[in-house]
């Protein structure tokens, strides 16, 4: 196995294979509902909003995977442990619950229901139909989670091309016969005055940056299996493979958001991206298109849900080995996901926003610290101060994103209004940014002031390890 990082590189075929793996890891049918909804609201400012969306929806996930390798961490629990052991458990649990049974898994059921099942029933008895559909959906998810087989691999290999094929036909139809001019559709809501930052925050909804921290170790392990071990080589090859994936995702987001913007010329506003997607599909392909879409999206989301249930169950089993077994976790997460799914897609998205406003700043700073930690020796004091400052600010971003009636009940409306007026970037949902920078600065100062004591402690620790190793070797020789 090679040690020279300059000679550790993937072949073109291997690069494409890992690019496909990254694409499958991050991109699901649910990802389409956010750019198309963003386009329907941003209208003529869609391209500006898209730039912000691509930063959080495409670039950050790639950086997240890379940071796991560069920081020499064994997954999310290892990277977050650089802040502290207690924090690593808190952040890992919060992240997996978010991309698991609280939001992402329930969304896997409500997206195909909203996009393709609900229109077939003409909006009648929606609660009953959703309950039946989600019950069947999660029964299948649980069955595959308890007894996974090769069918999931087959579904992934067959359905991803099918789904992309259907999407390509939709894009071509929109190009040949657009629903209207994007430039003629006025932006609404926050997109009218702050399209870039609103698009930036909309990218949070993909949850891909969070997923990159959770599943980044999978890509790193694949690279190691191909003889890529040096941190620099891991970063370089991940970026190389990820660039192909990012270009494909960016193109899909571009076309889908433009279609969403064009739809604003003929359709009234929708409650969520699922409704926009089904309206556009029906416009071009009629009810036949809806049925085809129902089949493809349902199975694609089914595969994603199984992956999330198995991932979350396995993680909680490893975090709490003496609590309950893996299969019990799978049952619990499937039942919780079923209950939350029956709130509906719009409610799930709305409830997830405050949580994402809290978690994303912590994820972004952790990713960047993992990437550039070599510059300060991955000193814990820098991780700790940055995280503490960011966490405090993120709590207020969480509060500001709560529904207005909740803020009123908590008597925090005036406080949030004051902060939006006087705290830099707070009104844009980026109030954590300056505190995070201050936290980095404070941590670097502490690291500099304690560098001699830290070096002495490291030398003593290394000497102890060497003595232990030598003693063990002597015993073995005897």
Stretches found by the model and what they are:
Residues 59-64, 162-174, 208-211, 238-264, ...:
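Selective recognition of specific alpha-helical transmembrane segments in multi-pass small-molecule
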Residues 70-74, 137-159, 225-228, 338-351, ...:
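Membrane-water interface regions at transmembrane-helix termini and the short interhelical loops
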Residues 75-84, 252-302, 309, 318, ...:
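TM-loop-TM module centered on a large, flexible mid-protein loop between adjacent transmembrane helices
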Residues 101, 105, 164-191, 209-210, ...:
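Hydrophobic alpha-helical segments and their helix-loop junctions in multi-pass secondary transporters
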Residues 144-174, 352-364, 383-393:
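Membrane-interface loop-to-helix entry segments
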Residues 147-158, 196, 219-248, 265-278, ...:
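Hydrophobic, small-residue-rich membrane helices and short re-entrant helix-turn-helix hairpins
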Residues 195, 379-478:
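A generic transmembrane alpha-helix motif of multi-pass inner-membrane proteins
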